[in-house]
């Protein structure tokens, strides 16, 4: 009888520990602009041995978030967050780290716009020349921040946008 009671208590304890809702697991990620931007870079970064963080990434974005990438000619490719996951899920994960270099935040009321320069690395401790600039739009609703969209352009020989951004005051 004691074993049965102990097993039942252990089972209930496990359920309460492991059955956290997304709100409980990721609440700290969306409490401030800094927190959500740190989570934004954290979810994409990691070693090939770490799992993708699709659930957490989805949580920090609004339901209809739009992602836009500009190619070297300025052409766009807007798509949904779910579309972003398809190529990731189809190939093995590689060591990939997006390291933020500089952030400028404009925040008015429940709206925020963030410029964020980043560098792509295969080792978090070794710098690279692969850099880009994100324009990230957020809104505050129901006690938390959401990423509504982001637009990314990579630096190239023709367009030194990250260098220009880093040199701004």
Model-derived regions, located:
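Short, low-complexity N-terminal intrinsically disordered segments enriched in polar/charged residues
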Residues: 19-54, 59, 167-169
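N-terminal, post-signal-peptide region of Sec/Tat-exported proteins
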Residues: 48-76
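A mature extracytoplasmic/lumenal domain signature
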Residues: 71, 116-118, 151
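A short, polar/proline- and glycine-enriched secondary-structure boundary/capping micro-motif
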Residues: 78-80, 125-128, 157-164
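Bacterial Sec-dependent N-terminal signal peptides
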Residues: 1-24
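Hydrophobic pocket/interface hotspot
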Residues: 40, 55-57, 65, 114, ...
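Short beta-strand edge/turn micro-motifs at domain boundaries
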Residues: 131-161
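Surface-exposed, charged secondary-structure patches
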Residues: 66-67, 76-124
């Amino acid at each position: 009888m004691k074993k049965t009671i102990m097993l039942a208590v252990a089972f209930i304890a496990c359920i309460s520990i492991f059955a956290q809702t997304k709100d409980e697991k990721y609440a700290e990620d969306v409490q401030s602009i800094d927190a959500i931007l740190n989570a934004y870079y954290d979810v994409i970064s990691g070693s090939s041995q770490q799992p993708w963080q699709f659930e957490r990434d989805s949580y920090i974005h609004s339901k209809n978030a739009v992602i836009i990438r500009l190619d070297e000619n300025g052409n766009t490719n807007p798509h949904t967050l779910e579309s972003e996951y398809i190529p990731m899920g189809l190939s093995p994960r590689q060591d990939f780290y997006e390291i933020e270099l500089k952030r400028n935040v404009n925040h008015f009321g429940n709206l925020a716009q963030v410029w964020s320069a980043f560098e792509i690395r295969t080792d978090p401790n070794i710098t690279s020349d692969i850099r880009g600039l994100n324009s990230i739009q957020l809104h505050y609703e129901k006690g938390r921040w959401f990423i509504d969209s982001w637009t990314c352009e990579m630096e190239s020989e023709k367009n030194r946008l990250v260098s220009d951004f880093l040199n701004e005051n």
